[in-house]
C-alpha cells in the first residue's frame, strides 16, 4: 500500500472550519501506529500546469492567488494555490502508481470534487480527481471512470467530465444535502445515485453495490475514486448511516473490479476518520 502525503497540507486552517489539518495529521498517526497493513510513504509528484488547464480555466488558476474568499465555505488562505497544486501533484502521482500496479491512496488536503472549471467551492480549490482522469485519457487510457462515494454530490467532477466520451462519473450521495445537485443522471456519462437522509445502512450499501456494478459495465481501464468518509453514521455534516465495516466492504468491492485504481481523500469530518480510512485501505489491500 502506497500513501502519498505532504506536510504542506497541514499548514493552513480557519477557526471553526470542519476541513481542518487534524483530518490528515491524526490519520497519519493512526496509519503509522498500526501494524496490519504495510505502508510505503511518499511525497506528491510535480504538478503539471498543462494537466490543471485540461480541467480548469486560466481565470480560476489566477484567482487562486487573489486574497479574497471564494465563498463562506471556501476561504482564501495565503499560499492556497501552492497547497492545491500539491494535492493535484499527489493525484497525478497516485495515477502513475496505479498504472504501475500499486494500491495507492492520496492522504492530502484540500479536497477537490466540488471545484468546477471556473469556480472554487465547497472546501475545494482544484479538482484533483478530474485532473487525474483527464491526464489518464491524454496519455493513452481509453476509458476512465470516477467513482465518488463522498456524501456530498461531486458537482465539480460531473461538470468537468460531462459528455466526455472516454469518461464516466458515478456519484453516490445524500440528497437533499450540499451542494443541492445530483438528483438525476446528466448527459450520456454522468450517473447519480441520490440517497435520502437517514437511509438505513443496508439500503445505503445496496445503492453502493448497484453503482459498483454499473461502473463495472463501463469496462474502464482506470478508476479514480473520490473517497469521502462523511456518509459515516456519526459524521457531523450529513445524515448518513455507514460504519467502518461498510468502508472496508467498499474497498473490497472496488479491489474486486480488477482494474487499476487510485483513491483520493475528499470529505470526512468525524474524529473517527482515521479508523474509517484504515478500514477502507484494508479492503482495498485485501487484508
Model-found features: residue ranges?
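HDAC/HDAC-like amidohydrolase catalytic core signature
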Residues: 1-287
Amino acid at each position: 500500500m502506497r500513501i502519498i502525503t505532504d506536510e504542506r497540507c497541514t499548514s493552513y486552517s480557519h477557526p471553526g472550519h470542519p476541513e481542518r489539518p487534524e483530518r490528515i495529521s491524526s490519520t497519519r498517526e493512526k496509519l503509522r501506529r498500526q501494524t496490519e497493513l504495510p505502508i510505503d510513504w511518499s511525497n506528491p509528484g510535480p504538478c503539471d500546469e498543462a494537466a490543471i488547464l485540461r480541467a480548469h480555466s486560466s481565470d480560476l488558476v489566477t484567482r487562486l492567488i487573489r486574497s479574497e474568499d471564494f465563498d463562506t465555505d471556501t476561504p482564501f488562505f495565503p499560499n492556497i494555490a501552492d497547497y492545491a497544486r500539491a494535492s493535484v501533484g499527489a493525484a497525478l502521482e497516485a495515477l502513475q502508481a496505479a498504472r504501475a500496479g500499486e494500491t495507492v491512496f492520496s492522504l492530502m488536503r484540500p479536497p477537490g470534487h466540488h471545484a468546477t472549471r471556473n469556480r472554487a467551492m465547497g472546501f475545494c480549490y482544484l479538482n484533483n480527481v478530474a485532473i487525474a482522469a483527464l491526464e489518464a485519457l491524454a496519455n493513452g487510457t481509453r476509458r476512465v471512470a470516477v467513482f465518488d462515494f463522498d456524501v456530498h454530490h461531486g458537482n465539480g467532477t460531473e461538470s468537468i467530465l460531462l459528455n466526455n466520451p472516454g469518461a464516466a462519473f458515478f456519484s453516490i450521495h445524500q440528497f437533499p444535502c450540499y451542494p443541492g445537485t445530483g438528483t438525476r443522471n446528466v448527459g450520456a456519462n454522468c450517473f447519480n445515485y441520490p440517497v435520502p437522509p437517514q437511509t438505513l445502512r443496508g439500503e445505503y450499501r445496496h445503492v453502493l453495490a448497484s453503482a459498483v456494478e454499473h461502473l463495472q459495465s463501463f469496462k474502464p481501464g482506470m478508476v479514480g475514486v473520490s473517497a469521502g468518509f462523511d456518509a459515516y453514521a456519526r459524521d457531523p455534516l450529513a445524515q448518513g448511516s455507514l460504519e467502518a465495516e461498510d468502508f472496508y466492504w467498499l474497498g473490497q468491492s472496488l479491489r474486486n473490479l480488477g482494474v487499476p485504481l487510485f483513491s483520493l481523500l475528499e470529505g470526512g469530518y468525524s474524529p473517527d476518520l482515521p479508523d474509517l480510512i484504515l478500514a477502507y485501505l484494508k479492503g482495498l489491500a485485501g487484508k
